[in-house]
UniProtKB/Swiss-Prot annotation:
Residues 106-131 are annotated as: Disordered. Residues 112-124 have a biased composition (Basic residues). The keyword Iron does not apply. This is Small ribosomal subunit protein uS12. Part of the 30S ribosomal subunit. Contacts proteins S8 and S17. May interact with IF1 in the 30S initiation complex. One of its GO terms (biological process) is translation. InterPro entries: NA-bd_OB-fold, Ribosomal_uS12, Ribosomal_uS12_bac. It comes from the Bacteria. It comes from Endomicrobium trichonymphae. The modification 3-methylthioaspartic acid is found at D89. The gene is rpsL.
Amino acid sequence: MPTINQLITNGRKGIIKKTKSPALKNCPQRRGVCTRVYTVTPRKPNSALRKVARVRLTSGYEISSYIPGEGHNLQEHSLVLIRGGRIRDLPGVRYHIIRGTLDTAGVDGRKQGRSKYGAKKAKVAKTASAK
């Protein structure tokens, strides 16, 4: 507990909020250009080849971002849209690429959770017995 004199000289320090996605600069999404597309192995109990892209954003930052879903069409100089959201088993990857926007294609053959992967609804063949 501080004394009155300590409060007069120093005052109370406010709590500083630290953002988890500084490259977005308080925007919901940011546009960027892929500078490198590669795979990374995850941290200890997991084993895989996670697809990652190095992206130069319009905010000036260069970040690593995860490419969700099975298969992708990204390469160097592709335009992508970035959202926040880290990948727990990839150190330093704090952003996701949004599928189905700009140069990023949606995931083919996706039936559930389509909105998260930019997949269109599959066409259903109409039968003649439906009267």
